[in-house]
Amino acid sequence: MIRIFSLHSAAVAALAAALATAPAAAQEAPIQNADGTITSAQDIVVLGSIGYRNRGENEAEPVLSYDSEFFQRFEPLTAGDALKRVPSVTFLSDVIESDGARLRGLPPGYTQILINGEKVPGSNADRSFFLDRIPAELIDRVEIVRSSSARRTGDAVAGTLNIKLRDGYELDGGYLRAGGLYYDDKELEPSIGGVFGGALGPGRFLIGGNFQGRHNPKKKYSLRYNDSPENDPNYATDPDVFENREDQTDTRDGKDYSFNATYDIKGDTTDFSVNGFYVHTDRTETERSFEYNHPTNINGPIRATPPGNLTVDNANVAKINQDNYSVNGKLAHRWSLGETSLKIGYAWFDEKQFETEYEVEFDRALPRFTGDQTRTGITDKEFSVRLEHEFPLGENTKLLFGGLWQDKDRSTSITEAPRDRYNLTAANRQGYDQFARNPTEFMRPFGAFVPAVGGINTIEEKRLDGFVLAEGDMPGVKWEAGVRYETTDLTIDDLTPPATRIDNDYEKLLPSASVKIDVGARGRITASAARTSRRPEFNFLSPAQLDAELGDNDLLGNPLLDPETAWGFDLGYEQKLGRSGIAGVNVFYRKVNDLIELTNTGVEGSEGAGTFVYQPQNIGDGKVWGVEFDLSTDLGFVGLPDTGVFGNISWLDSKIIDEFGERRFNGQSKYVYNFGVIQDIPSAGAAFGATYRKQGGAFDRTVGEEVFTAYGADLEVFVEKRFGKSFTIRAVGSNLLNGAKREAFNKFTTRNAQLGLEEDGTPADGRRFDEYELESEKAGPVFQLMARYAF
């Protein structure tokens, strides 16, 4: 962290760095190539117009495309930040973070994340990839593919987000970006990056690098009760119901280092490309929690002289180190029988985490110290080979077929040191000042680390896919129809003694079809239908049993799970507006089969009578539907060509029936919308704008816990000044409304308590809560000052 500079001095340093490294002269004219115009660096740094949403023209699938110009003026830090402005993407992240994208509000594992059209592994057990690992500066455009196609893997129930990074045929010249971000706790973090593209030998290359300081100073406030408003409307004022209050600071500090490079050769009959990116993250998550037995008092330990209200002091620190890289090569050759392409890719993800948690409990005859240490290591490697061929069937139709072979290896290692727990002296409590001292001071040397239950395992997934696809492009109509056959062999090794190996395999047939029909000169109907799938979460596949994982209930893994499958359709209409605007509406529906849900096996749990062993099984069905509207246009039709407006709203719904009743898919927001305006002032070389975003509430229900989540609104503004054709400076304010994330937790120890039954199964007088918790989290506004210089 940088602590000694002011925001003003950071801005001066950013400008000086950009100016000092810039050549005296810069290229201004873009270069032409066979595929169109290559963007000059000046066009990226000094935006000559307002960016709008594009519609996909090269494919029959329903695709929404957003170039970097659409996002850049608000200076998003990551791909996740950029996606907050597009339709139907929600997040359940902490405030001012955007990691697991939830397309159509569904859990992240239902969305396929691609980078340059290829899948990448991540650390998450649900197979999702956190988008806050990709710096926004690397992005050329973002594509939302609402349906599926036989040419891609079918892991896209909600749809696909394709992050297209810049390459040498999309940039000529270079630019530097430098600046700082100022946070609510007066911390300042740097942001420095650069990109350069140009000709090299017979082709073109691009290299880019970025360094980003990350910081999130969250403050959490929790109130806990032994009953809820379901049973006691006066719970908040009833002293017999109040349990404790927790005040917590949760600070996330990190440094991201990223690099990407591409090299492309486009010949008369043969094309070659190779691209890669690398991201390294060092991150420290520091939580400090104080629990009090009073709703408002802030003082010293309970049972001291004089007695205070502090019952627990907890210090929790996680140090995380992540490396992620991907390399892909493609060779395409056009010959008398069509075009043949070969793609080879390798992706690797590695995470190492060391977490400590130290706690002192004061509400005892003698205060007690408890210490825990955990080490987590996750490595995920994927190697893939893709061979495809296409040839014409007629003047307007062609046939594509091909196959994919992929070898995925994932290893997990979770080890724990034996818990250190011992009593302190009464003198340790007397005069203890939690704001000056820390439970860490009572730490003693730990013993050797040993595997956690089910914590050491490997998963090998080999898949062989084949597909065939026909597509046509006729005046006013573009269509495609195909089928994909996916086969998977799975080997799971639980290496925690006693070691266990289990094999599984499955096959899925996934047909798909899409069509686009022009309506008049500027309208278009889009329609698609497809069968898609979602593979089981890794943490469900381990055969280990985790005791008291779900309240007092146990969780037993199931390595024989099959993927979920879904039939669905999208139907939409798009209308071009003015010079470059577009408006669209879309309805979608998914019928999910073989839904993976936690199921009561009927076996008594480790905590005795009233508790059970739960296991994920393919037993459920679900439905998802919604309506999506988006608008992006200038106001030239009312005489304001330099004013751009954009907005979108999505209404989202779903239905699942579990053992507790009907609910939505976990975490699905009821709606999400955002709208904004950008005013360009060409005569002054300036621009300003604002965007407003609001996400509806969400509900999660699992065995032993229910969570209601709500977010406050988010307001962002920017002011931009351009200097000549090569230099731009922007000031951006985000989270200006200091929106809070608010959660309400219903917690239960047994299934019957959650159902509102006595342990003998007879009806109870309301549900029996183990705990009802209200939590609020805020982080404050963030201000940026960024400078860019093109050369």
Regions found by a protein language model. Name each.
Residues 91, 118-146, 194:
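Short acidic/polar hinge/loop motifs at secondary-structure boundaries
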Residues 694-698, 721-791:
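C-terminal beta-signal and adjacent terminal beta-strands/loops
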Residues 589-591, 609-699:
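Gram-negative outer-membrane beta-barrel transporters
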Residues 52, 80-119:
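Extracytoplasmic beta-strand/coil segments of soluble accessory domains associated
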Residues 184-287, 318-338, 511-513:
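Transmembrane beta-barrel wall of Gram-negative outer-membrane proteins
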Residues 316-325, 455-462, 522, 533-592, ...:
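Outer-membrane beta-barrel signature, preferentially recognizing the C-terminal barrel domain
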Residues 134-173, 177, 218, 790:
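A beta-strand signature from Gram-negative outer-membrane beta-barrel systems
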Residues 43-74, 100, 108-111, 118:
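N-terminal periplasmic "start-of-domain" segments of outer-membrane beta-barrel proteins
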